[in-house]
Amino acid sequence: MRSFLVFIFLFFISKPILAEVPKESLKYKRDLIRHSRIIWGLNAPVPLFAAQIHQESSWNHLAKSKYAKGLSQFTGGTAAWIIKIFPELENTNVYNPNWSIRAMLLYDRWLHERISSSGECNQWAMILSSYNGGLTWLERDKEMTKNNNKDPETWWDNVETFSSRSNWAYQENR
């Protein structure tokens, strides 16, 4: 009986807890939606972009990892590179949430235009892997996948299983 009551209690309180939007995300919600729709169109996958920011920095615009900084965790090299591709990002400040959101969305769009895959789910898996590890590594992984008689257009159980990256980079970028 006691186990049943604990189960009922946990069942009813777990749903609201799991369904909560991270409080930290709310201050960026309007900007994320606006920039997403400007860059990706009215059908922009805003929840996917929100999940990406949550994974990258937990909505902390001052976040620092070993190699990257800011809300969308740009490395110094990628931040320097992206302003050459997108001059409108010229006033680089990885700690500025608006800059960081726009840079992430533009980079995702740039990757989306260059990656071929067998469907939207595979496409986004490859985009997100490339976001963290670079497009060159994805292209190498796809070539290795093809050389092993697997499908280079499918991420799951195919491209995701092949890489010549070092162990730490493989873990970081998968």
Regions found by a protein language model. Give the residues of each.
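Cell-wall polysaccharide-cleaving catalytic domain and substrate-binding groove, primarily
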Residues: H54-T78, K84, G134
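N-terminal targeting signals for Sec/Tat export/insertion, comprising classic cleavable signal peptides
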Residues: K27-A50, K64-A68
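Short, surface-exposed helix-loop/turn micro-motifs enriched in polar/charged residues
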Residues: A44-P45, A63-K66, L71, T92, ...
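Positively charged n-region of N-terminal signal peptides that target proteins for export
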Residues: M1-F4
